[in-house]
Amino acid sequence: MKLSYQGIQDKQGYAAAQVALPQYDWAKMAEKTAEKPVWVHFGAGNIFRGFIAGLQQRLLNAGLAESGIVAAETFDYDIIDKIYVPHDSMTLMVSLKADGSTQKEVIASIAKGIKANCADEAQWQQLTDVFTAPSLQMASFTITEKGYALRNMKGELMPVVVSDMENGPKQAHHAMAVVAAMLYARYQAGAMPIAMVSMDNCSHNGEKLRASVMEIVAAWVKNGLVPADFEAYVNDEARVSFPWSMIDKITPRPAEIIEKQLMDAGFEDMQPVITSRNTYIAPFVNAEVPQYLVVEDRFPNGRPALDKAGVYLCDRKTVNDTERMKVTTCLNPLHTALAVYGCLLGYTSIAAEMKDAELVKLVKTIGYKEGLPVVTDPGIISPKAFIDEVVEQRLPNPFIPDTPQRIATDTSQKVGIRFGETIKTVSYTHLRA
């Protein structure tokens, strides 16, 4: 079986492989998207394909949307050429349950993948056409926190950013300059409203996106490359909003065991590829089942019915409280503790650590005894239920190929936020028992 528009016409074969198919016609969806795009997403990698695209799939399956998502890649163009194009932008999603079973579904809600490359005139024009469409409601992002950075570790502007600031919208290479260039195209087409929604796993992500885009725009204005009114447009949150969000879903690199299962089931061309930018990516995505997305509800041009797809829509304070709950008490401190001790004790699997009674006692103490008494309750997600799921389902899942070595990366930069807030607020009197 092939993963493509023609391939999924083999409904009998897909049914035999126990793979759910989209309940809509991909070609018609792609046509509707080309006519009236609603949603463009920057960052065409696994978290987008395995989580965000699935949200739109739910809406399409339920008849709550007609168009799909346009994926734009600013960093690794090989992803488009080697993964999107051969498979009609479809993804074989494999959800890994704690009991060892899997749930498989073809995610077909991505209408097209575009290389956000100003040197490729045709691709650049396609992206510009999307951004100048009055129908466009949102641009979302999963480009990692590094994707927003304009400066190096010394605080100096990166050479590519300096070049972008000097050359203007037509020669934009850094991701933030590309975004600013697309907003300039939208401004020129009538200064239409849009929401710019960072969905990256970092605190105050919307503010990080806004600050970086505004710095590029301000430099262009200063250098006489764009009018000052464009800066006013981007700075007006009634027209260009930058909502905050909180995202949570473990989406590790493609696992060899999953590749083998899919090949044994009759699928062709499931092998991962390593791109020229060292991205490890496959036609399939494997990830855990639990997932959370909390988004500040500020969309000046309307939005898809995300609340009908399991997304929590709320105000900024609630987003921040949910992020604080996850990062400072209910998930990240537990993860970091396991990562550090896992490396020291020679473990190569988080799930294997959760079979060690002493390590389980450690994470339960950090979570339940130290964290929960001082947790920030966001009101939309129960901290107790969240941490129960982490300890009982997510961390012990042996089918999530996550390692303490990966999580331990940059621990020195994470200790303050992951443990410091609890240390500052906890009263240890309740620990004496």
Predicted segments — roles?
Residues M1-F42, N46-R432:
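Substrate/ligand-engaging "lid" and interaction regions
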